[in-house]
Regions:
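Transmembrane alpha-helical insertion/packing segments
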Residues: 1-58
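Membrane-interface helix-boundary motifs at transmembrane edges
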Residues: 2-7, 70-84, 154-157
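Hydrophobic alpha-helical transmembrane segments
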Residues: 12-13, 52-62, 83-87, 123-145
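Hydrophobic alpha-helical membrane-insertion segments
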Residues: 14-27, 84-106
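Canonical alpha-helical transmembrane segments
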Residues: 50-79
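Membrane-cytosol interface at the C-terminal ends of transmembrane alpha helices
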Residues: 64-74, 92-99, 144-148, 152
Length: 157
């Protein structure tokens, strides 16, 4: 099991870029897709979330990121290299989660961290809709980078 050192940065870089792009896609395109705005009799604008569209949008976004990463970005990597690289990103996510949970009033100045947690966070949102909110969802969603592992090659060519 030899891991090429130049491949260790690929999954963390891809996850951070994909999370940032997912954040902006959700904010700008998602608003037009799953937010329903109506004007009631009194002339007030009410905004509601269409939950079916929300689930479809987030599921599609998660799968697009997963498939683009697995089929394009990590094509030349072995399964072991992807697992090690994804493990690095998972450890970073779990450290940040530990800091967030240990500080009762997590500083709002560090809100920028949320942008880089968007892609794995989609998984926890979808699981929370099915199972209900639970603290374990915060931990399991950060294992999402490990889902790239089956897309790797069995050995280096």
């Amino acid at each position: 099991m030899k891991v090429r050192k130049q491949t260790l940065w690929r999954v963390p870089a891809y996850c951070l870029i994909a999370s940032c792009l997912s954040f902006y896609v959700t904010v700008y395109l998602g608003d037009a897709f799953f937010m329903v705005r109506t004007i009631d009799e009194s002339g007030l604008l009410t905004t509601n979330l269409n939950i079916v569209r929300y689930v479809l949008f987030n599921s599609a976004l998660f799968l697009i990121v997963l498939l683009l990463g697995g089929l394009c970005a990590f094509r030349s990597m072995t399964r072991v290299e992807i697992a090690v690289s994804a493990g690095i990103m998972t450890v970073v996510y779990l450290i940040v989660l530990g800091i967030q949970l240990s500080l009762p009033q997590f500083p709002t100045a560090i809100f920028i961290i949320a942008i880089f947690q968007t892609w794995p966070g989609i998984l926890s949102h979808l699981l929370a809709l099915v199972t209900g909110p639970h603290i374990l969802l915060a931990v399991t969603c950060f294992l999402a980078p490990l889902l790239f592992t089956p897309f790797g090659r069995k050995q280096v060519q």
